[in-house]
Amino acid sequence: HDRWRSRVRGLPEFGGELPVAAMAEEIDTPGEGQVRALVTSAGNPVLSTPNGRRLDAALRELEFMVSVDIYKNETTRHAHLILPPKTGLEVPHYDLIFHTLAVRNTARFADPLFAGHPDGRTDAEIFRGLTQRMRRRSTKHRQQNIVKRTQQAALLALSPTQQLDVALRRGPAGGWGGRLLRRDGLSVAALRKAPHGVDLGPLEPALPERLY
């Protein structure tokens, strides 16, 4: 908290983020550090944030805006590019939200039901392409040490399903989670054999380990 502050009003960051109420002023207030480009994803801040009229006007002043979205709405209408990702039954699914609200420890994975358009791209593929293009133009990225750049490149090379597989295997129920490798550990391959999901038992306390 409060590791740095917003340019215009000096609002403190929290968790690496600024209050959304600062977005419009950071775009329409001239000076060093003024926001001149914006990337949005599946959102409509013109309607969902305070002082939407000011933000609506500010978005018109951007030099470049790209929206990863399947809808043209009050926000994305200002984008120079709208990149629609595959969605719904065209993409693999692993629930990250409702698993955290469950009363038991469960896991379930589903492959795409439909292939989608041959030219279509997933959110991950779109953001990977944007990231690679931005890094080519970034002096800061080129100045990073080779180890960090290699780590970032390796992460970008993994698909979301591959990243999920690594996370499952490294988790407490995964084959890499204990001291010994286990063939029966949780993985994407194991979940594919259980299309209705797996029940790993009651929840277990984990907060102390997450804190220390």
Feature names for model-found ranges:
Residues H1-P12, A153-Y212:
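Long, low-complexity segments enriched in small/aliphatic residues
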Residues H1-L168:
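Non-catalytic alpha/beta scaffold blocks inside enzyme catalytic domains
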